[in-house]
Amino acid sequence: MLEVEGVTIHLISEGKGPLVLFVHGSQAWSYAWRYQIKPFAEAMYRVVALDLPGNGYSAAPSYHGYSVVGNSRLIGQVLDGLQAQQVILVASSAGGLPVLDFTIRHPERVCALILSSACGMPHSLPGLWNLIRLTLVGEASRLFLSPSLIRKNLVEAFADPRKVTREDVEAYLRPLLRPGSWGANLRTERSTDPTFVEQNLNSIRCPVLIVWGKEDAWHPVAMSETFHQQLPQAEVEIFSNCGHLPHEEQPACFNQSALKFLEGKVK
């Protein structure tokens, strides 16, 4: 645990070396990086996977700014708390927005970026995310949180539904049922404004790896090319037979690509 301006942040930490900070997406937590923590630590990196406020097992205070800028600021505060001046940032899905925002505002602190089907370019939202942004509808949807709903969402996110396990369903559902968690998730969804990131993305100069699933049903694979147009220095890896969560659905391929990308860039 790490205290950041009165907010208790849950972290998973392992290894020694250059810091790699993993940031999860919507309605997720550090469990999303379960397949990356040990391989990156064994490759001589200091691995930290955080739970953003209101997610996983971090606190969900009403005074936290559940916006892109608020979570971007929190990333900087976490780095300060870890006494780290520089970092390699790894982001999945909606976690891309605060990570990119932080990189744009503090380029001197970011050695490299790894984006796994990340937000940061204009795109349409899946139906569920549009619904929960509606007043009252989002609050009422808390009543329907169940293993079957979580399984449905994960199956949509994977190209191969057989890879969705009961353990995964339970792991993603459990934190959402904690007091304050669903309300914090709603505030995050409703406060998300990608404008600053979209307008300033091409200012990023650090090395970037873009990883995408060819069968991503939520962020079409064409988004990876749009990202590449804004970040011409980026390396792009497209995984076949893979959906929205490459680091979870094809972790061995993801880890191999990411660790190879980092060779010689930060050590």
Mark where each language-model region is.
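Active-site loop/oxyanion-hole signature of alpha/beta-hydrolase fold enzymes
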Residues: 12, 49-90, 94, 256
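Flexible "cap/lid" loop of the alpha/beta hydrolase fold
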Residues: 104, 111-141
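Short beta-strand/loop motif that positions the catalytic acidic residue
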Residues: 204, 210-212
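Short alpha-helix in the alpha/beta-hydrolase fold that links the catalytic acid
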Residues: 168, 206, 220-229
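Conserved alpha/beta-hydrolase catalytic His-Asp/Glu region
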Residues: 9, 124-125, 143-203
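Catalytic active-site module of serine/aspartate enzymes centered on a nucleophile-bearing elbow/loop
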Residues: 234-267
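Conserved HGGG/HGGXW glycine-rich cap/lid loop of the alpha/beta-hydrolase fold
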Residues: 7-57
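Acidic catalytic loop of the alpha/beta-hydrolase fold
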Residues: 215-219
